[in-house]
């Protein structure tokens, strides 16, 4: 599987995409989580749709519109990768067991702060996937995929249909609720 990130430029691109990460996150240390996040995205959008983004990613001279389109796929993958990585980065795993990472300039956040941050990151991820799905549901190429046709076969197949009875405001949630 081809990832939408290059090892050589990963740390800088990851920081720029997320905007709140100030560390140089090593590609090799997150590659398995990046792969998991990518596979999860492929499950949502399908391999042919993901492959279109790979082609766009590998393109040499992209237009501004193409860069915006690429961001729609890369941001949720990066956000999900961070959600998977962050909890294990809070602790140092040593021969003596798990240890707290500290230094003179930083203070350890309270548990409730970490939980709120994790919840906020999860909401960011869900919003990003919903934005991608909104884009895809208007895309003629996506309308030809198995993923789109599977969703359309249900009696309640859009968020508008579902929201007549219960407000969810999320295509991702609707997809997860589908049988």
Please give the residue ranges for each predicted region.
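Conserved short "hinge" loops at termini or chain/domain junctions
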Residues: 1-74, 88-179
